[in-house]
A protein has these predicted regions:
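N-terminal alpha-helical scaffold/docking segments in eukaryotic complex subunits
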Residues: 1-55, 204-211
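Alpha-helical adaptor scaffolds
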Residues: 137-164, 169
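Long, ordered, amphipathic alpha-helical scaffolds
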Residues: 169, 174-181, 185-216
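Alpha-solenoid HEAT/ARM repeat scaffold
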Residues: 12-19, 31, 46-47, 63, ...
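Alpha-helix N-cap/helix-start positions at coil->helix boundaries
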Residues: 11-12, 27, 42-43, 74-75, ...
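Amphipathic alpha-helical scaffolding segments comprising HEAT/armadillo-like alpha-solenoid repeats
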Residues: 1-6, 24-38, 57-70, 89-101, ...
Length: 216
C-alpha cells in the first residue's frame, strides 16, 4: 500500500490508507484490503476488516471475514462480527455460535448481538440458557434483547414466564408486550399482578395487554 503526499506533508499512516481503500472501486483496492487483513499489526487488520465491511464490493472478500472470526485478536474478531451483522452473513452462523463461549465478555456480547441478525430457530435454547445462567448483567441483557426481538409463537410463553419475574423492569415490560402479541385471555391473572408493578412502564404495558386480550 502506498499513497502519494505533497512535498513536506506527513505521509498518511497505514490506518489512513486502509480506510481510504473502502472508498475505492476496482480489483486493486480489494486486493490491497485482502493483503491488509493479513498484516501483523492487529489494529491494522481490524481496520482492514472494517474497510472490507464498508466497501461496495466487500462481499467478494467474505472468506476473509469468516477467517477473521478466528483471529487471535479479540478486536479483529469483534469487528468481523460487526461486518457479519451488517451483511447478515448466514455463512458465519456456526463461527458466531462458537464465539458465545469466548473468554472475553465483550466478544461474547458482540457475538450474541450478531447472532440476532443471522438467527435460526435452533438458536433459541442456546441464547435462553445464556440469559438464565450468565452472571454478567451486560450479557444477560444482550441475550434478553435478542430473545425479545426473535420471539415467536413457539416459545413466547417460555420467555414470558422468565421475563415477568425478572428484576429488570424493562424485561417485565417485555413480558407484557409478549402477552399482548401472542397470548389468550387465560394469562390475564398474571397480567393483573403486573398491572400493580412498582414500575410505571410495566403497569402501562400490563394494562394495555389486558385491554387487548379482553377484547379478543
Amino acid at each position: 500500500m502506498s499513497c502519494n503526499s505533497p512535498s513536506g506533508a506527513h505521509p498518511p499512516t497505514t490506518h489512513q490508507v486502509i480506510r481510504k481503500l473502502a472508498l475505492q472501486e476496482g480489483a486493486a483496492a480489494l486486493k490491497a484490503l485482502a493483503n491488509a487483513a493479513g498484516l501483523e499489526d492487529q489494529f491494522e487488520r481490524r481496520a482492514a476488516i472494517d474497510a472490507i465491511g464498508r466497501h461496495p464490493h466487500g462481499r467478494e472478500l467474505r472468506s476473509i471475514i469468516l477467517r477473521a472470526l478466528r483471529d487471535p485478536s479479540e478486536y479483529v474478531v469483534r469487528t468481523a462480527c460487526e461486518v457479519v451483522a451488517q451483511w447478515e452473513l448466514q455463512e458465519a452462523h456456526e463461527l458466531v455460535v462458537a464465539l458465545l463461549a469466548n473468554p472475553s465478555k465483550a466478544t461474547r456480547q458482540t457475538a450474541i448481538r450478531t447472532l440476532g441478525t443471522i438467527w435460526v430457530d435452533a438458536d433459541f435454547p442456546t441464547v435462553f440458557r445464556i440469559y438464565n445462567d450468565a452472571w454478567e448483567n451486560e450479557i444477560r441483557r444482550e441475550a434478553a434483547w435478542v430473545l425479545r426481538q426473535r420471539a415467536h409463537s413457539a416459545h413466547w410463553r417460555t420467555l414470558f414466564d422468565a421475563f415477568q419475574v425478572d428484576e429488570l423492569a424493562r424485561h417485565r415490560q417485555w413480558a407484557c408486550e409478549l402477552a399482548e402479541k401472542f397470548s389468550v385471555p387465560d394469562i390475564l391473572p398474571v397480567l393483573s399482578q403486573l398491572s400493580s408493578d412498582v414500575d410505571g412502564h410495566v403497569r402501562k404495558a400490563a394494562w394495555r395487554a389486558i385491554q387487548t386480550l379482553s377484547s379478543r
